[in-house]
Amino acid sequence: MSKPRKPKGRPISGWLILDKPMDFGSTEAVSKLKWLYKAQKAGHAGTLDPLASGMLPIALGDATKTVPYVMDGRKIYEFTVSWGEERATDDLEGDVTQSSERRPTEQQIRDILPRYIGTISQVPPQFSAIKIAGERAYDLARDGEAVEIPSREVEIFRLTLLGCRDANTAHFEVECGKGTYVRALARDFGRELGCYGHISGLRRTFVAPFSEDAMVPLANLVALEAIEDMDERLAALDALLIDTCEALSALPHLVINDDQAHRLKMGNPILVRGRDAPIAESEAYATARGRLIAIGEIGQGEFRPKRVFA
């Protein structure tokens, strides 16, 4: 019987909060960082369109197991809407599908915003990663197929008009939940105002729980390639990583001993009784000696592991 293949790359674990430049795809960014860090695995926590810039959290190594906890977090975007044209992609890339000479006043824009705050029904753009009958909507759209994408509920926590540089554009900031399409907001604003609209600028500034000052520009990472000594270069890159546990900061935290850590790594539950144990049944994570050991469920006085870390 052949031995299982040893994964290629370094067994590192952590998050790099990339400040993604425009005209650089999210998948391309993940591949670049995986190569730079010589990591075994890499993945991002939410696609950022190539025309968008800003925060793209990228998980390396075992941190990829925590991606779902970041995907579910709140996000903040700054975006510019250009009035007068609706486009196939709802951004600058697409062909113009509708146009209007009408332009909204600043007060008219402010008047519609309250209707987009809270739980709203939103139809994703035709060019989106939504699956229709097993195929991505953007693949069907590129093939010229007009598909009906069902609406879905999304959460908008805050929506602010930051200003209007001129009659043709308006600048906004939105704090929203998982699955919200900012391009769809621009499209819907334009339709309601009777002037049509599309995204002409988009920047993500926050993905919970990571703050804007954690972002590292791609140019800073590329500059480290000039360090000839590989060990020195990797050490400089590793210094930019955020601890894997940061992605789990919204969950209850258990500090355990070495014996308990061993039990969890073997897939066995541990007792969590005592004054510091969480009372309510919930998901939680456990660390020993500052290292992440497992994510699991607390219930009936036990912590049962779901995901175990090396």
UniProtKB/Swiss-Prot annotation:
Q: Which InterPro entries match?
A: PsdUridine_synth_cat_dom_sf (IPR020103), PsdUridine_synth_N (IPR002501), tRNA_psdUridine_synth_TruB (IPR014780), TruB_C (IPR032819)
What exactly does this protein do?
A: Responsible for synthesis of pseudouridine from uracil-55 in the psi GC loop of transfer RNAs.
Q: What class of enzyme is it?
A: isomerase
What are the positions of the active site? D49 (nucleophile)
Would the keyword Ion transport be found if you checked this record's keyword annotation?
A: no
Spell out the Gene3D superfamilies in the cross-references.
Pseudouridine synthase
Q: What GO MF terms are annotated? A: RNA binding; tRNA pseudouridine(55) synthase activity
For this protein, the record's HAMAP family field holds: TruB_bact
Keyword line = Isomerase, tRNA processing
Q: What is its EC number?
A: 5.4.99.25
The protein depicted here goes by the name: tRNA pseudouridine synthase B
What family, per the record?
Belongs to the pseudouridine synthase TruB family. Type 1 subfamily.
* Gene behind this protein: truB
**An individual GO BP term:** mRNA pseudouridine synthesis
This enzyme catalyses: uridine(55) in tRNA = pseudouridine(55) in tRNA
